[in-house]
């Protein structure tokens, strides 16, 4: 490793990543044909990924200077001793995107004998298709660091650290017209889609005696599957006794003749369903500025912006020419789901000893779900000893914390402290309807319809924004107004060590809220002779509704704890 890497250019200096491209494709087609049925399976798997390969500058010491811009993108500049990076233009230390995509499709088609066994079978066609897809954009950050020395970052124009790390064994000094230490965002998209359709002719033999035979057969099969022989024998004996009891009950109820307890059922029907799901998740990746010694951040003409990131050192000093903004980043999630299904059938049944009966039936259902959530990631500025901040204009702490054993602040205009509320909403709507008409020996009309709904909302402060002083207290001077919205200025020190001077003081509480509403309503129609009294004719079926809400308050504080 060289002892020092000096580099000077009158033009831009770019320390950039390379990208590896990986791609994979798998396809399968398989068809199996039997005497009475066939099955075709198609599989499609595809994925691709762009993998970041970082550039690395590593030496005993590093000194980089540019007459224009310096850009460190998805790469690393590290040294045992001091690292100095100076740009006469802009200085950007930032993350880069690493993209990946995948898609999986499986389709299964069946025809002929779809199911059999017992005393029935179905002949027809069936198709099922499942699809999964993902598109991800992740961030790979840069690192500028010194193991035993200091890191000095200077820009005549803007200095930006985005989704990256600056680390030093000693001090970190960052200077620019405008200084930003902010998060980057990774985005994850996922989709699912499922489809099913089945059409066929079903034939079955039913009746009380048939049920006994089927139950006995199932008991024998269960007994054969049991590993313990004694337990298997007991299962078989129980099955025999249950069958004998069922036959006696049938005879006792006047069903002594076998032909009076047999029926032949034939139906032609179709059923189909479809469901989809789409989700997008955004995850914030914090920048980290951490020093074993002091951290000094200075903007010479404009603002200092800390967004969803962390700054830590022995003593931490912010000196903003204009505004000091310490704000939160946020993670978001959005999910949309939908589903629908329908079925229809025409059937005929002949029960020996009675006349034929016919039936027509159909049903449908539809559902939708929408969910959205936002969570905030506070910026944290931590001084193990003294924390000092100064702004020529406003100091805005909105989704952030400043903490130190002693906190000193000088604000040229307003000091605004505001806590952020995480939020979540969930909405669900469901509809369904069905009807059946019986003709012949089993005349009846029945039907039902229902509508259901869920609506849930939530807002709450998870982390309270503010200024936290240790046993040395705080000394804060604000020229115009101090405004607290669910904010806090707190200290562990005695009262005489805590001082705050402001032109005016305004404050506002933040209400945490949670509410939940759910309800359903339906109607039933049943004209069958066996309909229960409560459902005879046309009756409403009112679902049990639910409603609840809760509130709490985040109050501003300015006190000694």
Q: Locations of the language-model features?
A:
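Binding/recognition "hotspot" determinant
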Residues: 1-561
């Amino acid at each position: 490793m060289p002892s020092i890497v000096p580099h000077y250019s009158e033009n831009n200096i770019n320390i950039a990543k390379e990208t590896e491209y990986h791609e994979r494709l798998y396809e399968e087609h398989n068809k199996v044909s039997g005497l009475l049925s066939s099955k075709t399976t198609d599989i499609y798997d595809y994925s691709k990924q762009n993998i970041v390969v970082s550039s690395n500058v590593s030496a005993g010491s590093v000194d980089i200077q540019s007459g224009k811009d310096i850009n460190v993108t998805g790469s690393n500049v590290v040294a045992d001793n001091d690292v100095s990076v100076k740009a006469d233009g802009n200085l950007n230390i930032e993350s880069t995107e690493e993209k990946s995509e995948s898609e999986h499709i499986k389709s299964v088609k069946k025809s002929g004998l779809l199911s059999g066994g017992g005393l029935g079978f179905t002949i027809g066609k069936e198709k099922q298709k499942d699809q999964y897809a993902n598109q991800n954009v992740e961030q790979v950050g840069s690192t500028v660091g010194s193991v035993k020395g200091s890191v000095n970052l200077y820009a005549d124009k803007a200095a930006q650290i985005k989704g990256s790390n600056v680390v030093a064994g000693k001090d970190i000094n960052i200077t620019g017209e405008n200084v930003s230490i902010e998060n980057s965002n990774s985005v994850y998209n996922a989709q699912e889609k499922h489809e099913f359709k089945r059409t066929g002719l079903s034939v079955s033999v039913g009746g009380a005696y048939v049920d006994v035979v089927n139950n006995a057969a199932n008991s024998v099969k269960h007994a054969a599957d049991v590993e313990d022989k004694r337990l298997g024998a007991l299962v078989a004996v129980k099955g025999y006794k249950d069958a004998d009891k069922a036959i006696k009950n049938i005879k006792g109820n006047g069903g002594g003749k076998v032909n009076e307890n047999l029926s032949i059922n034939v139906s032609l029907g179709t059923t189909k369903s479809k469901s989809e799901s789409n989700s997008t998740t955004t995850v914030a990746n914090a920048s980290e500025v951490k020093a074993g010694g002091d951290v000094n951040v200075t903007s010479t003409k404009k603002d200092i912006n800390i967004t969803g990131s962390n700054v830590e050192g022995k003593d931490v000093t912010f000196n903003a020419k204009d505004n000091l903004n310490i704000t939160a980043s946020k993670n978001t999630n959005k999910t949309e789901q939908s589903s629908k299904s329908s079925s229809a059938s025409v059937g005929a049944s002949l029960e020996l000893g009675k006349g034929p009966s016919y039936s027509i039936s159909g049903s449908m259902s539809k559902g939708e779900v929408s969910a959205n959530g936002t969570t905030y990631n506070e910026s944290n500025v931590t001084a193990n000893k003294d924390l000092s901040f100064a702004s020529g204009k406003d100091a805005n702490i909105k989704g952030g914390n400043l903490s130190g054993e002693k906190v000193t602040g000088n604000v040229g205009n307003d000091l605004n402290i505001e806590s952020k509320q995480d939020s979540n909403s969930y909405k669900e709507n469901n509809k369904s309807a069905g009807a059946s008409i019986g003709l012949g020996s089993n005349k009846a009309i029945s039907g039902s319809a229902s509508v259901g709904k869920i609506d849930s909302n939530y807002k709450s402060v998870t982390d309270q924004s503010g200024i936290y002083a240790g046993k040395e207290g705080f000394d804060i001077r604000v020229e115009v107004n101090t405004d607290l919205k669910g904010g806090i200025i707190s200290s562990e020190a005695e009262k005489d060590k805590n001082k705050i001077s402001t032109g005016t003081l305004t404050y506002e509480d933040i209400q945490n809220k949670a509410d939940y509403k759910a309800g359903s309503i339906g109607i039933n129609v049943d004209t069958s002779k066996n309909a229960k009294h409560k459902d005879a004719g046309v009756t409403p079926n009112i679902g049990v509704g639910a409603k609840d809400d809760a509130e709490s308050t985040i109050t501003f504080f300015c006190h000694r704890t």
